[in-house]
Amino acid sequence: MKYQVVIGLEVHVQLLTNSKIFCGCSTRFGAEPNSQTCPVCLGMPGALPVLNKKVVEYAIRAGLATNCRIAPRSVFARKNYFYPDLPKGYQISQFELPICIDGHLDIEVEGGMKRIGITRIHMEEDAGKLVHADVPGVGDDSCVDLNRACTPLLEIVSEPDMRSADEAVAYLKKLHQIVVYLGISDGNMEEGSFRCDANVSVMPAGSDKFGTRTETKNVNSFKFVKQAIEYEIERQIEVIEEGGKIVQETRLFDPNTGSTRSMRGKEEAHDYRYFPDPDLVPLVIGNDWVEDARLSLPELPDAKRQRYTDELGLPVYDAEVLTATRELAGYFEACLALSPQPKPVANWVMGEVTRALNEENRSIADCPVTPPLLADLLRLIEKGTISGKIAKTVFDEMWRSGKAPEKIVEEKGLVQVSDTGAIEAIIDEVLAKEAGQVEEYRSGKDKLFGFFVGQVMRASKGKANPALVNEILLKKLNG
């Protein structure tokens, strides 16, 4: 029997605010356990939450960037459950009236586009963290770190529109790129700033009735999401074909085995006994607030890619690479403003700049070759002062020393030879030395032309103007 896979994702995005959602405690990652807490974080009696305005602004920006409608009125609700890392005994979230609804993202699937619906985006606080590893002085006991409690989150809930693990990863990558572009999250998956719950079910192909779903919690890498979904698909199909039934449950992914395991029975909404939080008034968002947020949005990746292909004439591949991060796109555009040659600038940014960054594991913000320096280098190539090959040598020296390209060219005597007389002399010397190869070329072995070009460039120590070398060499060989 053939099966249809149904996938929906719930993505938790930790927001890049300095303070928590309902108190003034720091959100800094990596602090000493329980050093960033207060009576609100700890759920002490009488401590009242105060909503962080920045969290609301970030939620609105996320909603606009994902084509959602911003609700004019939304309400915080208490999600009641017991867990050691939840000191209040409930989590402040949103239920019936979230801040953003009815959005979508378009993803590329097998050369075409597919629209993935977004049911809702809501604000909520994170729970604390249980540490199960051995702790000095504690032994094998589990410890609770409440630094993360009350940290602001957005939960972005998709429609069950994905039909493969690849589609789920494509959606997740696009969402990740958007929240990082917006500057509302650092997207650090290792630190838990961007994590995903994957809801997976299977049903007979052609059926319109969804199967029983399982939820795999807190998967924190694109690779693991793909593995978890693919494993869960295979597991569910195997259970069904052996005559069993899928249990609606919450599962955990084990990256060491690439498998999922049962964690607990899957709760329904009524199990959490949601009700409006009496300590927080309904949130009313006016049109002015929404429009201000809309005007503050940066150019998003899709629009930027389209502009690069339509207005700059760049290939689709180049546009995708250059818009991978907002910082890389900014570097490219800063170079382009100083040296308006889209394709050459793109080639250098995607080539030498990216290579050097990767070799030293640097970010583009830490690039020692600034846009003005790279633009100066490209101008030297354009004017014919140096060749493209020599330019790579100059770039490496710029990277190491931070010197201007003109100074490096002058100090090392790298100016390109464009004097026809000097180039002719070098060519004559090479042809005289390779008389046998010349005869073979003239007998029809045209491929030897590249050999002669290489010999001339070697004899000139790479300084000869390649265009002139080709032109003069062709005349002499065919003359």
From Swiss-Prot:
User: Is Ligase included in the keywords of this UniProt record?
Assistant: yes
Which GO terms of the molecular function aspect are on file?
asparaginyl-tRNA synthase (glutamine-hydrolyzing) activity; ATP binding; glutaminyl-tRNA synthase (glutamine-hydrolyzing) activity
* Pfam family name, one: GatB_N
The keyword Ligase is annotated on this UniProt entry: yes
Which purpose does this protein serve, as stated in its record? Allows the formation of correctly charged Asn-tRNA(Asn) or Gln-tRNA(Gln) through the transamidation of misacylated Asp-tRNA(Asn) or Glu-tRNA(Gln) in organisms which lack either or both of asparaginyl-tRNA or glutaminyl-tRNA synthetases. The reaction takes place in the presence of glutamine and ATP through an activated phospho-Asp-tRNA(Asn) or phospho-Glu-tRNA(Gln).
**Family according to the record:** Belongs to the GatB/GatE family. GatB subfamily.
What's this protein's name?
Aspartyl/glutamyl-tRNA(Asn/Gln) amidotransferase subunit B
Q: Which organism is it from?
A: Geotalea uraniireducens (strain Rf4)
